């Protein structure tokens, strides 16, 4: 695998577990974010167990397990307790990474930090992009939560919104020693999904061509591969 391909994380947004192996082993990427909240069976134990069997595939990519709640425009409609239990079972099944929202209380975050999985703490703003100071305060808050990687995604309404978000990557590294993924969603923010890699983000999120995007503005796998080749990354 080339360095450029290792920077690409494919977002698996699928209601069915059929043909899961093809996406977990998809060529030309380095990771898969599995949006388990998109599964029809996520709200039943058997349905989740059927999906998690895919984590036993020997040749799969590392997986970032995500069960996004409705409050962050995700598909999980059960109780918060049930959602946390689903995440715990995902870690026990062998997911290498877990994505957790930054509004979770410490007593929920702590067991995940102590688990075998690495933790991404994420913050999403689907309405817009705050000013620079509130964004930096948000990074400071995320950095206190003990994650391996921080993630901030806001919705861009102007080109300048992207610049404020992208500057969080070197800011977090310099101030807190934190690896950070920071980009903007939406058509105006699309280019930041490439630029974040050039600024030092460990990976960026793309969609599989056959599947829906997990957030507005995502490139396909092939599009991001081409862009990385054009700019000479990796």
From Swiss-Prot:
Entry-linked HAMAP family: AroD
Catalytic reactions on record: 3-dehydroquinate = 3-dehydroshikimate + H2O
Biological pathway: Metabolic intermediate biosynthesis; chorismate biosynthesis; chorismate from D-erythrose 4-phosphate and phosphoenolpyruvate: step 3/7
SUPFAM superfamilies assigned to the protein according to its UniProt record, in alphabetical order: Aldolase
Entry's family note: Belongs to the type-I 3-dehydroquinase family.
Protein species of origin: Syntrophobacter fumaroxidans (strain DSM 10017 / MPOB)
GO molecular function: 3-dehydroquinate dehydratase activity
GO BP term, pick one: chorismate biosynthetic process
Residue sites binding 3-dehydroquinate per the record: 33-35, 68, 193, 214, 218
Active site: 124 (proton donor/acceptor), 151 (schiff-base intermediate with substrate)
Protein name per the record: 3-dehydroquinate dehydratase
Function, in words: Involved in the third step of the chorismate pathway, which leads to the biosynthesis of aromatic amino acids. Catalyzes the cis-dehydration of 3-dehydroquinate (DHQ) and introduces the first double bond of the aromatic ring to yield 3-dehydroshikimate.
Keywords from the UniProt entry: Amino-acid biosynthesis, Aromatic amino acid biosynthesis, Lyase, Schiff base
Keyword Coiled coil carried by entry: no
Gene name as annotated: aroD
A Pfam entry, by short name: DHquinase_I
E.C. no: 4.2.1.10
Subunit (UniProt): Homodimer.
Keyword Ribosomal protein part of the UniProt annotation: no
Domain of life: Bacteria
PANTHER family: 3-DEHYDROQUINATE DEHYDRATASE
């Amino acid at each position: 695998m080339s360095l450029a391909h290792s920077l690409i994380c494919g977002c698996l947004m699928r209601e069915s577990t059929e043909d899961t192996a093809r996406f977990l082993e998809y060529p030309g990427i380095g990771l898969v974010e599995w949006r388990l909240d998109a599964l029809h069976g996520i709200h039943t134990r058997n349905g989740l167990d059927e999906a998690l069997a895919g984590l036993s595939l020997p040749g799969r990519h590392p997986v970032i397990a995500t069960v996004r709640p409705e409050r962050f425009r995700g598909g999980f409609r059960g109780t918060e307790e049930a959602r946390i239990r689903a995440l715990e079972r995902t870690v026990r099944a062998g997911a290498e990474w877990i994505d957790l929202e930054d509004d979770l209380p410490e007593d929920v975050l702590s067991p995940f930090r102590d688990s075998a999985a690495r933790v991404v703490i994420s913050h999403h703003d689907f309405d817009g992009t705050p000013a620079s100071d509130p964004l930096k305060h948000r990074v400071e808050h995320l950095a206190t939560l003990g994650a391996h990687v921080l993630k901030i995604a806001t919705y861009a309404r102007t080109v300048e919104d992207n610049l404020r978000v992208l500057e969080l990557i070197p800011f977090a590294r310099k101030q807190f020693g934190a690896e950070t993924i920071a980009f903007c969603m939406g058509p105006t923010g699309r280019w930041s999904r490439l630029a974040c890699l050039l600024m030092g983000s460990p990976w960026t999120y793309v969609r599989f061509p056959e599947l829906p995007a997990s957030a507005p503005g995502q490139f396909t796998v092939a599009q991001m591969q081409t862009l990385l080749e054009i700019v000479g990354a990796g």
